[in-house]
Design a protein with these regions (language model features):
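Lipid interaction determinants
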Residues: 2-3, 7-11, 17-125
């Protein structure tokens, strides 16, 4: 009887932990990128803690200033968005996935799963 009770408690704890993580961050696809991030100025934090400002323009151009300085192009992708910068990555395109945290920040992930940046807030251009 004790082992059944212990298994029930452990199972309930794991379920609660899974629910907590699921509520913490929601995967973001291209529809939300289009609605919430395109045509906005992003205030971002880079992985090294430095700040930058990124302009994600409606015309498909993008600029970043601060910890990095570059310009290039972006496009929507089935799982998020892709960028091609003039200098960064020698002009190679890279696609990113995103999630939105419970406090409204967007975390942007590289293909290898590392965080590329965290969007702390956005404002209209």
């Amino acid at each position: 009887m004790r082992s059944i009770l212990a298994a029930t408690v452990v199972g309930a704890s794991l379920a609660a932990a899974s629910l907590s993580v699921a509520q913490e961050a929601q995967k973001v696809g291209p529809d939300e990128v289009q609605q919430a991030l395109v045509g906005k100025v992003w205030e971002v934090e880079l992985p090294d803690g430095s700040s930058a400002t990124e302009r994600f323009n409606v015309d498909g151009t993008v600029t970043i200033h601060g910890g990095l300085n570059d310009k290039g192009y972006w496009r929507l992708w089935e799982e998020g968005y892709c960028t091609t910068w003039f200098r960064m990555r020698n002009g190679a395109e890279r696609c990113f996935t995103l999630d939105r945290t419970a406090d409204g920040k967007y975390r942007v992930y590289k293909p290898n799963g590392e965080i590329s940046m965290t969007i702390l807030g956005t404002k209209e251009q």
